[in-house]
Amino acid sequence: MTWFTPEVIDVIISVVKAIVILLAVVVAGALLSFVERRLLGWWQDRYGPNRVGPFGMFQIAADMLKMFFKEDWTPPFADKVIFTLAPVVAMSALLIAFAVIPITPTWGVADLNIGLLFFFAMAGLSVYAVLFAGWSSNNKFALLGSLRASAQTVSYEVFMGLALMGIVVQVGSFNMRDIVEYQAQNLWFIIPQFFGFCTFFIAGVAVTHRHPFDQPEAEQELADGYHIEYAGMKWGMFFVGEYIGIILISALLVTLFFGGWHGPFGILPQLAFFWFFLKTAFFIMLFILLRASIPRPRYDQVMDFSWRFCLPLTLINLLVTAAVVLLNTPAAAVQ
């Protein structure tokens, strides 16, 4: 009797895939800080980091060494357990959310029938990390930043979910692979669900607290917001977690609206990973371009925009999609 039964081999392969994907995401999140600075320098007609190594390519290694050797200080007035737990929860929730994203037909961690719901569960868990960080720091600026962040995240997650309901109505499934395969046989959802895409993208920027929705970390108002008391690797986990969030939202946009691993018009299906990577990289660059080109609005304007613009748009999109699907459904199937 051998231990390496087909079931055991499948488990080992799944674990190896999970480790490879999660390590790749963490490394990519760290590298994005360098990529962002280089792109911002290019767009703003300056050099950016260009001193460490050829073309500044070793700058990220220098930053990581600096962060690693910094004092991992915990304020004496902080709740030490929750203060330490917050960055772990923040980064873990984002990494676990990657489990349901299919990168290629064969590469993915978990093929869940409730993939979309699982993503929203993990996204909601990240709110607790922000609240933990702000409250446990025992700092008024950190607390105000965490309250801003949690209110903003919860508000925009509502529209993020409603924006995807049009896709669920058309496909009839919460499974990510089903959504990708549906787009392979029909139009990519960027066309029939354009308004849902717009709302999801806006909500994605807001949920990741990226510019122009970075009010929870506004330096001029809150002195860096909910992670003001963090230093060393704890701060580094929040820092890298922000870039992992960008990768996550970009990968979701590709999966849900741009055909996932499929190329345009089914071109070169054997290059599945290339198409997924190329489309994800485009949206990552778009996130960075927003930081370089759009001013930061006031917090009340951000919240007003969410409830007065995003909510009606998502509801109209959902109602129109439901009506179109109902009209195209045979009467016998409806009964």
Curated annotation (Swiss-Prot):
UniProt cross-references to HAMAP family, sorted A to Z: NDH1_NuoH
NCBIfam families (UniProt xref): PRK06076.1-1, PRK06076.1-2
Keyword Nucleotide-binding in record: no
Keywords: Cell inner membrane, Cell membrane, Membrane, NAD, Quinone, Translocase, Transmembrane, Transmembrane helix, Ubiquinone
Subunit structure as annotated in this protein's UniProt entry: NDH-1 is composed of 13 different subunits. Subunits NuoA, H, J, K, L, M, N constitute the membrane sector of the complex.
Originating species: Pseudomonas fluorescens (strain SBW25)
Protein name per its UniProtKB record: NADH-quinone oxidoreductase subunit H
InterPro entries hit by this protein: NADH_UbQ_OxRdtase_su1/FPO, NADH_UbQ_OxRdtase_su1_CS
